[in-house]
């Protein structure tokens, strides 16, 4: 394996931060006062990212709720995905005894809040205003410990999603069947089938057939938790169809097999092309991001320690022994495009770089228009930038 890392060509003018962070200025409904949340759930702990005061940037961020029984792994998921905690270190985390609010915005393209709920939360407690919390929530993630008896968890799942659906039917409901690293493949499939069947039967009995649950097998000891969170976050991105379309156009004109648009900090992929996601390919791309950041921390910082491990000049090429090439390029301050292609296709690097320049410009236009209009933009937004894409070296305007 060979690694090439260094500065790329002159960056696109204004690229560093031009597209900035996704829903920073999008309207997701006004969030209630933080004091209300504290009164509703016995206090809200300040997250590592720090919370903004009422009326600040918090009011435009989608909210993701992490719920589940005690010791199901909720806090571990949050720490591993968004705070780079080693999975082994999560063994020393204390149980959550109050609502813990984590603001994911200062160092990530993915701009939202995660509320980690204690396992003993009682919805029938008159002092708990669950309606206030469920209003304005983008997604509810319910974590079930697959290695434990999950009958009580299924009962709590049904109560939780039923109440949430009545308050906010537009919310996405996600179920993480967690800690599956200790189960055999057959046991994983059987556990997922059983939980899926029982949960949906309970909803059908309650007349909630329209309530859709999405199920994921997850573990903090592999990349499954990152992939699951990627799919959860993608549902909250109004520009997702546009991003997928841009990626499809880019790879079809550049001879690329697979491309991911990554949030560098969390390793969540914001979008990918329409071809199926192979877990091994995703893991390769995640590992490449780790390598690039680690190498950059060693050689990319200034003598006084200033600078950034990832900036507008970041670019890396890794050539594997099986003639596969991994190619990483900076898109925005927090986004990177990671491509998988064959060595013979990479011989046309000039073509790929030109098409990437057009792709990056289109991405910036998508989010600039989105911030201005407070709504997801259509495909017309980026049409002008993609007209210049070349196919087999021939400019579009020359065809």
Swiss-Prot record:
Report a single Gene Ontology molecular function: GTPase binding
Q: What is the effect of changing residue 115 to R?
A: In LNGODS; also found in patients with follicular lymphoma; maintains the GDP-bound state leading to constitutive activation of mTORC1; results in altered regulation of TOR signaling
Q: What is the effect of changing residue 74 to R?
A: Found in patients with follicular lymphoma; increased activation of mTORC1
Locate the Phosphothreonine modifications and list their residues. 96
Location of the protein in the cell: Cytoplasm; Nucleus; Lysosome membrane
InterPro entries in UniProt: Gtr1_RagA (IPR006762), P-loop_NTPase (IPR027417), RagC/D (IPR039400)
Q: What's its job?
A: Guanine nucleotide-binding protein that plays a crucial role in the cellular response to amino acid availability through regulation of the mTORC1 signaling cascade. Forms heterodimeric Rag complexes with RagA/RRAGA or RagB/RRAGB and cycles between an inactive GTP-bound and an active GDP-bound form: RagC/RRAGC is in its active form when GDP-bound RagC/RRAGC forms a complex with GTP-bound RagA/RRAGA (or RagB/RRAGB) and in an inactive form when GTP-bound RagC/RRAGC heterodimerizes with GDP-bound RagA/RRAGA (or RagB/RRAGB).
Q: What is this protein called?
A: Ras-related GTP-binding protein C
A GO CC annotation recorded here is: FNIP-folliculin RagC/D GAP
State the organism named in the record.
Answer: Homo sapiens (Human)
Supply the EC number(s).
3.6.5.-
Task: Tell me which residues bear N-acetylserine.
Answer: 2
Give the start-end ranges of region Disordered: 1-20
Which residues does this entry mark as bearing Phosphoserine? Answer: 2, 15
Q: Please name the CDD domains in this protein's record.
A: RagC_like (cd11385)
**Subunit-level organization:** Forms a heterodimer with RRAGA, in a sequence-independent manner, and RRAGB. Heterodimerization stabilizes proteins of the heterodimer. The GDP-bound form of RRAGC (in complex with the GTP-bound form of RRAGA or RRAGB), interacts with RPTOR, thereby promoting recruitment of mTORC1 to the lysosomes. Component of the lysosomal folliculin complex (LFC), composed of FLCN, FNIP1 (or FNIP2), RagA/RRAGA or RagB/RRAGB GDP-bound, RagC/RRAGC or RagD/RRAGD GTP-bound, and Ragulator. Interacts with NOL8.
Q: SUPFAM superfamilies from the entry?
A: P-loop containing nucleoside triphosphate hydrolases
- Activity regulation as described: The activation of RagC/RRAGC is mediated by a GTPase activating protein (GAP). In high-amino acid conditions, activated by GTPase activating protein FLCN that stimulates RRAGC GTPase activity to turn it into its active GDP-bound form. In response to amino acid depletion, the GATOR1 complex inactivates RagC/RRAGC by securing the GTP-bound inactive form.
Residues that, per the record, bind GTP: 74, 90, 96, 181
The disorder on record is:
Long-Olsen-Distelmaier syndrome: An autosomal dominant syndrome characterized by lethal dilated cardiomyopathy, bilateral cataracts, mild facial dysmorphisms, and liver dysfunction. Some patients have brain abnormalities, including pachygyria, polymicrogyria, and septo-optic dysplasia. Death occurs in infancy.
| Reaction equations catalysed | GTP + H2O = GDP + phosphate + H(+)
């Amino acid at each position: 394996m060979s690694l090439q890392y260094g500065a790329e060509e002159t960056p696109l003018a204004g690229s560093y931060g031009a597209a900035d962070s996704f829903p920073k200025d999008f309207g997701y409904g006004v969030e209630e006062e933080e004091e209300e949340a504290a009164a509703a759930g016995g206090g809200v702990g300040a997250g590592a990212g720090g919370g903004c005061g009422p009326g600040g940037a918090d009011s435009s961020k989608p909210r993701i709720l992490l719920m589940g029984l005690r010791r199901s792994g909720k806090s571990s998921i949050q720490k591993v995905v968004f705070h780079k905690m080693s999975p082994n270190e999560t063994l020393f985390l204390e149980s959550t005894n109050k609502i813990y609010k984590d603001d994911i915005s200062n160092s990530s393209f993915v701009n939202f809040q995660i509320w980690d709920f204690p396992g003993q939360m009682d919805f029938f407690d008159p002092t708990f205003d669950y309606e206030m919390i469920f209003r304005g929530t983008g997604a509810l993630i319910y974590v079930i410990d697959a290695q434990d008896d999950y009958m009580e968890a299924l009962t709590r799942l049904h109560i939780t999603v039923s109440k949430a659906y009545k308050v906010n039917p537009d919310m996405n409901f996600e179920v993480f069947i967690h800690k599956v690293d200790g189960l055999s493949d057959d046991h994983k499939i059987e556990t997922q089938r059983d939980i899926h069947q029982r949960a949906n039967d309970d909803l059908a009995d309650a007349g909630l057939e329209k309530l859709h649950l999405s199920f994921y097998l997850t573990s903090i000891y592999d990349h499954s938790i990152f992939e699951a969170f990627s799919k959860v976050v993608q549902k909250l991105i109004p520009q997702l169809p546009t991003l997928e379309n841009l990626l499809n156009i880019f790879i079809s004109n550049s001879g690329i097999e697979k491309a991911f648009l990554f949030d560098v900090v969390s390793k969540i992929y914001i979008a990918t092309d329409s071809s199926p996601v192979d877990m091994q390919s995703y893991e390769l791309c995640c590992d490449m991001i780790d390598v690039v950041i680690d190498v950059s921390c060693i050689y990319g910082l200034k003598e006084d320690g200033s600078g950034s491990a990832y900036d507008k000049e970041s670019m890396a090429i890794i050539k594997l022994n099986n003639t596969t090439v991994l190619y990483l390029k900076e898109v925005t301050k927090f986004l990177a495009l990671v491509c998988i292609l064959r060595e013979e296709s990479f011989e046309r690097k000039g073509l790929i770089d030109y098409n990437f320049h057009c792709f990056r410009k289109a991405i910036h236009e998508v989010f600039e228009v989105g911030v201005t209009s407070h709504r997801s933009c259509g495909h017309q937004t980026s049409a002008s930038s993609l007209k210049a894409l070349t196919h087999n070296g021939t400019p579009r305007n020359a065809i």
